Amino acid sequence: AYLSGDAATLIETYLADAGISFDELSDGARLADLQERIIEPLRQYLLQAECSGAFVLLNATAGKNAAEPTRSGLYLQVNGYEADRREIILYRGIPSVGKAHGIMPHRKWRLEAQRNVIRGWDDSHSRSHSYSDPARMPAHTYRFTEIFTLPGMSEKAMLLMLPIRGSDGKALGVCGFEVSESCFARLHSQTTKLSHFTGLLTYDDDSHMDGDSIISFFSCGADDGYYRAPGGVLAVSDFGDGILKLTGDDNTYLGMKRSYNDARTGGSFATFVMTNKSDYDSAAMDTIVKNLLLIALLTALSIAFCVFFSRSYLAPVLKSLEQLKRDEQRAHRG
């Protein structure tokens, strides 16, 4: 919400200083001036947040004759997630503005963002459409997009989107943050004793889960050691005793699922905690072997105890009884 409010203030301040309306922004020089004001605050938001990208995209474009609708603005990404080395790059925006601040264009850079691939653009506006006063917009006006692949990128991402609305309620654009699958894997790695722990996050809906298959998801592993992300579609089946079997292109997992709803955004999510089936089978075999050894040991101890008891206690008693019996027989004969 802070990013949305600050972006609206920066936009309206620039419009007032330039003496123009928002509808007159569709000019390269004016858009460059506005991006110059936005880029440093946006970079600070990105550096402070645990995410892989941050953006401010406007309901304005310099390419009105483009074949596909685009929107001007800034979209910054983090190149590397180490705390002491976080390079910021320009994914969308005017390159001269970025270079002036030491931010170089991404190798898949484009000037503007295609509106049809920024998932949730229209929905972000519709959620806040009835609030003419932005200060009265509730927190649930933000939303998470589906997990998808950004144009030109190789990995999947999810966006948290908020509408930008002026003091008069006018829709100025959208802003928010990006979480890529590699960023998710780093932030949510777990401390565990499992050799090959794997965690999944996905939407519990038809666009991400096709019947008994998981189509699109984020994954994470243990915070130490090697981690290999599951590949392809994961087919889900019942393994018994509340355990699920998940079969991928190159591995099979066993795990458990938990579903939950986000009341503020209306999203339904599902998390899976899994381990390799081969690890489970190995652990199960180890348990069987240990149980057999324990049974054999207990049996041997029982036999040894019986032998010891018979020799130490039972044999003398029987010998005494036998002696008494012989004594009685001699007494009767005498």
Which residues fall in each region the model found?
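Extracytoplasmic/periplasmic sensory segments of membrane signal-transduction proteins
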Residues: 1-132
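Extracytoplasmic/periplasmic ligand-binding sensor regions of membrane-associated signaling proteins
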Residues: 94-176
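Conserved beta-strands of PAS-like sensory domains
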Residues: 152-190, 268-279
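A short, hydrophobic, proline-anchored segment that marks a local hinge/packing element in signaling
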Residues: 158-168, 254-265, 316
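Short, hydrophobic beta-strand elements of compact beta-sandwich sensory domains
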Residues: 173-181, 246-287
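Cytoplasm-proximal transmembrane signaling helix
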Residues: 202, 270-328
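HAMP-domain connector/hinge
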Residues: 329-334
